[in-house]
């Protein structure tokens, strides 16, 4: 059965930015601060390293009853029995991913336009990651998405939307009244010296919108 997901504060990992010794430590601190969902994103490591990292991170997420999503790698997601997988526009098509993972896993898709959003929803996405909303150092090649486009996406799809890309605690208020379901955060949590406090502050800002 597909898990019920709270998308509100969604940490996307980046080992190059983390302020802690280990990724597991960063993830646990973020969860203690209020992160409700974790995505393990590893772009520059071997399959074995990714798998081993996923096993260790899943021990932390399982301990706190927080779902783990794997970025891009359907095989890793299935191997560690993660809650689901997240794919981008240049990854395996969402419809194929859905066939592989079945109906009991969560499928997230990165989108930046209404057309991409509608296509993702049609192909079985459970949620959309919309952005990049602002310029970001973590994905320098990411196309930007306007607030107007975000509103159009919200009006045209019924599945949950999380926004991503350059979001920090001071920008959360920009999304007031749009109807987003969560914030996908990288550096504004994982790069902070005090990860737990950073997550708490973002959660407090999200509650206001």
Curated annotation (Swiss-Prot):
Which amino acid positions bind 2-[(2R,5Z)-2-carboxy-4-methylthiazol-5(2H)-ylidene]ethyl phosphate, per UniProt? 136-138, 166, 186-187
* Pathway participation: Cofactor biosynthesis; thiamine diphosphate biosynthesis; thiamine phosphate from 4-amino-2-methyl-5-diphosphomethylpyrimidine and 4-methyl-5-(2-phosphoethyl)-thiazole: step 1/1
- Superkingdom, natural source: Bacteria
| Entry annotated with the keyword Flavoprotein | no
Q: Which Pfam families match?
A: TMP-TENI
| InterPro entries the UniProt entry points to | Aldolase_TIM, ThiamineP_synth_sf, ThiamineP_synth_TenI, TMP_synthase
According to UniProt, the reaction catalysed is: 2-[(2R,5Z)-2-carboxy-4-methylthiazol-5(2H)-ylidene]ethyl phosphate + 4-amino-2-methyl-5-(diphosphooxymethyl)pyrimidine + 2 H(+) = thiamine phosphate + CO2 + diphosphate; 2-(2-carboxy-4-methylthiazol-5-yl)ethyl phosphate + 4-amino-2-methyl-5-(diphosphooxymethyl)pyrimidine + 2 H(+) = thiamine phosphate + CO2 + diphosphate; 4-methyl-5-(2-phosphooxyethyl)-thiazole + 4-amino-2-methyl-5-(diphosphooxymethyl)pyrimidine + H(+) = thiamine phosphate + diphosphate
Q: Where does 4-amino-2-methyl-5-(diphosphooxymethyl)pyrimidine bind?
A: 39-43, 71, 110, 139
- Which terms under GO biological process does the entry name? thiamine biosynthetic process; thiamine diphosphate biosynthetic process
One cellular component term from this protein's GO annotations in UniProt: cytoplasm
- As recorded in UniProt, its EC number(s) are 2.5.1.3
Q: Which cofactor does it need?
A: Mg(2+)
Annotated Gene Ontology MF terms?
magnesium ion binding; thiamine-phosphate diphosphorylase activity
Q: How is the cofactor bound?
A: Binds 1 Mg(2+) ion per subunit.
Q: Which CDD domains match?
A: TMP_TenI
EC class of this enzyme?
transferase
Tell me which family the UniProt entry assigns to this protein.
Belongs to the thiamine-phosphate synthase family.
What does the record give as the function of this protein? Condenses 4-methyl-5-(beta-hydroxyethyl)thiazole monophosphate (THZ-P) and 2-methyl-4-amino-5-hydroxymethyl pyrimidine pyrophosphate (HMP-PP) to form thiamine monophosphate (TMP).
This protein is called Thiamine-phosphate synthase
């Amino acid at each position: 059965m597909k898990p019920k997901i709270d998308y509100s504060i969604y940490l996307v990992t980046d080992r190059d930015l983390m302020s802690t010794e280990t990724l597991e430590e960063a993830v646990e601190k973020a969860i203690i601060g209020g992160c409700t969902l974790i995505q393990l994103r590893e772009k520059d490591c071997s399959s074995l390293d990714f798998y081993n990292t996923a096993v260790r991170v899943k021990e932390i997420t399982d301990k706190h009853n927080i779902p783990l999503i794997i970025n891009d790698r359907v095989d890793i997601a299935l191997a560690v029995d993660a809650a689901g997988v997240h794919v981008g526009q240049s990854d395996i098509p969402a419809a194929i991913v859905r066939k592989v993972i079945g109906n009991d896993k969560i499928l997230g898709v990165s989108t930046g336009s209404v057309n991409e959003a509608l296509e993702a929803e049609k192909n079985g996405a459970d949620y959309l990651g919309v952005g990049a909303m602002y310029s970001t150092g973590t994905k320098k090649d990411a196309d930007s998405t306007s607030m107007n486009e975000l509103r159009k996406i919200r009006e045209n799809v019924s599945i949950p939307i999380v926004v991503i890309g350059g979001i920090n605690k001071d920008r959360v208020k920009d999304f007031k009244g749009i109807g987003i379901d969560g914030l996908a955060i990288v550096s504004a949590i994982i790069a902070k010296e005090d990860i737990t406090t950073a997550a708490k502050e973002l959660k407090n800002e999200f509650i206001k919108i």
